[in-house]
Amino acid sequence: MRGRLQGVELIARDWIGLMVEVVESPNHSEVGIKGEVVDETQNTLKIMTEKGLKVVAKRGRTFRVWYKGKIMRIKGDLINFRPEDRIKRGLMMLKRAKGVWI
């Protein structure tokens, strides 16, 4: 159960500074993009990779995220809100946590 709670906590927080990797995407060239999130908008993550800055849409993607010593998979549709709105809606995310795996 603790893993699910950490997943919900992750969904409801700002992602800037987290390490992420795109593991599923309708755009096959995005799969494998890995780096640190340097900016976040409602619909995109800006990821600094070894090859430079990449902008990846959230919707329709699945991300591997390194958070508090754990690796989690998060569906981008669950975080497709402005970061400040996700934080305000933290309790609502409990109901949507079906997309969180450890």
Swiss-Prot record:
HAMAP family, per database record: RNase_P_1
Role, per record: Part of ribonuclease P, a protein complex that generates mature tRNA molecules by cleaving their 5'-ends.
Group of enzyme by EC: hydrolase
Keywords: Cytoplasm, Endonuclease, Hydrolase, Nuclease, tRNA processing
Any GO CC annotation of this UniProt entry: ribonuclease MRP complex
Family: Belongs to the eukaryotic/archaeal RNase P protein component 1 family.
GO biological process: rRNA processing; tRNA 5'-leader removal
Organism superkingdom: Archaea
Identification of the protein by name: Ribonuclease P protein component 1
Quaternary organization: Consists of a catalytic RNA component and at least 4-5 protein subunits.
InterPro entries: RNase_P/MRP_Rpp29-subunit (IPR016848), RNase_P/MRP_Rpp29_sf (IPR036980), RNP1 (IPR023538), Rof/RNase_P-like (IPR023534), Rpp29/RNP1 (IPR002730)
Organism, scientific name: Archaeoglobus fulgidus (strain ATCC 49558 / DSM 4304 / JCM 9628 / NBRC 100126 / VC-16)
Listed SMART domains: POP4
Location of this chain's protein in the cell: Cytoplasm
Name of one Pfam family that matches: RNase_P-MRP_p29
EC number of the protein: 3.1.26.5
